[in-house]
Amino acid sequence: MMEIKLKNNILKQTLFLAFTITFLSCKNDTKNSGKGINDIITNDTNSSVINIEERSFPKETDLSEYPKTEFITTLESKINTSKNNVYCVTMLYAWNEVKNIVNEPFKIDSNFKHLTLLNNSSSFKDVLNPDEYIISSEIDGFNIKAKAEFKKSLTFQTELNSYKDGLKFNNEKVASFGITGIYNYEQLKIVSILYYKNDNNFIIKLHPKDSNHEIILFKSEKKFDKMNDINSEIIKLIVQGKEDKQNENIKWKYDILEEDEIIIPKFNFNIETIYKDLTGNTFDTKEKSYTIERAWQRTAFILDEKGAEIESEAEIEYYTEEEDPNKPKPKKMIFDKPFFIMLKKTKSQNPYFGLWVANTELMSKN
């Protein structure tokens, strides 16, 4: 939420930008679960936003309670890879609504680098259909409010396996889910390998029931500065993966074999923040000067699989001796080190949600 005031002899206005309530949910359907995040409480196909029951999310917590996590407002924002970084498109949608309200050219002081970055970003375009989010605005005297709201549930057709204490991320035990081997054909249909070099460099895709959306997970030893750099790398490697599949010697990398494992941490958080580096920023039109009084955003995200509870612990051994790279061997695609998650439309180049995972702060613990 932003308030904007005019200064000196120029007309004074206040602008509230409410970058609000972003719900992202990736959770399986369960036949006897009762109402929860799994439920889509609407039969109206024309409804602009899917109604997700909020009680499945934890209570809102201020970002200051998460010292190892940061929010970013654009894909072009620089990320601190030693911390978790959370991005969602609602901030850009709300700012775009402000520009529509002002509806005339304006200037931003070059010292306001965050606001300039927000204003120049175009990575929000076409990442969601118009009926998948709500943009609203209100003008009350000299006060202007702009709000962007987005709620989305991505459910899976079939439960994946749930592993209690089955994963160590940076040597800390966390709850996890995934698949092991080829024992359940319905589970295999949910997971695709888009790129595989080795157990530390790969991309997988999770297929929700809504085939217009996809969940991409990327583990890499390469260093990145921005999420759009990560996205560009993913696009490039997916092309490489398609080429690899045509090579008879290595196409085994793209099949899930009997001894393969895919294990992913569970996430459950509901975080709000005020962007202090946007507070007090100004931009000027010919006759008006606007000052941002408050910029607020809340993002809630669940990535969780309620499959059969299995008491097991994954141990991974890494071998240093040279091996034939073309010889099939078990793939251990285990997200136990920093990695990237993004949610996007299948036909869109850019994601509407991105999460750089550097530590366990946002993960579910048992």
Identify the meaning behind each predicted range:
Residues 31-366:
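Hydrophobic-core positions in well-structured secondary-structure elements of globular domains
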Residues 3-15:
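Bacterial N-terminal signal peptides that target proteins for export
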Residues 24-25:
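C-terminal motif of bacterial Sec signal peptides marking the signal peptidase cleavage site
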